Amino acid sequence: MVFVKTLHRTLFLEVAANEDVLSIKQKIEAAEGIPAEEQRLCYAGRQLEDSDCGIDSEATIYVNLELLGGAKKRKKKVYTTPKKNKRKPKKVKLAVLKYYKIDENGKITRLRKECQQPSCGGGVFMAQHANRHYCGRCHDTLVVDTATAAATSGEKGGKKGKK
């Protein structure tokens, strides 16, 4: 005896130990009216073929119906242009040394100006431009007067490297 769970109810069928799945499908067709070729029988997590036999007594067989249609297998998308490589920032070893200078007496002086905003806190240096200092974190800009900057630094301003 096996239990057959259909869509609406559970059937009890007398099945011999050596009986194949095709004969079980025919018994279900007689009881329920579902054609044998549309039935899909599942037992122990796998679908049974018509030639399978040797189902245990008091086993539960699930009846599923054949479904029409289904989604097509999609093609893998082929891109015409290659992927754009992300820009990797250059690693500078001991970059902190650019922010400080040590004289012959051993005195440490800051080369860059620190940001005064309370949101940045200490240790955030501002970028040096020709006429201003700029904080990349809080976007604070301090404009430097060109007359005083030229007098203190001894340079005329303009682009670096050209003399």
From Swiss-Prot:
Which PROSITE patterns has this protein been placed in? UBIQUITIN_1 (PS00299), UBIQUITIN_2 (PS50053)
Q: Which GO terms describe its molecular function?
A: protein tag activity; structural constituent of ribosome; ubiquitin protein ligase binding; zinc ion binding
Q: Name one GO biological process term.
A: modification-dependent protein catabolic process
An annotated GO cellular component of this protein is: cytoplasm
Stretches that traverse the bilayer: none
Q: Which UniProt keywords apply?
A: Isopeptide bond, Metal-binding, Ribonucleoprotein, Ribosomal protein, Zinc, Zinc-finger
- The domain of life is Eukaryota
Please tell me which positions the record assigns to the cross-link Glycyl lysine isopeptide (Gly-Lys) (interchain with K-? in acceptor proteins): 70
| Record domain Ubiquitin-like: where | 1-70
Supply the Pfam families for this chain.
Answer: Ribosomal_S27, ubiquitin
Keyword Zinc in record: yes
Q: Where are the zinc fingers (C4-type)?
A: 115-138
The Swiss-Prot or TrEMBL record describes its family as follows:
In the N-terminal section; belongs to the ubiquitin family.
Q: What is the protein name for this chain?
A: Ubiquitin-like protein 1-ribosomal protein eS31 fusion protein
Q: Which organism is it from?
A: Caenorhabditis elegans
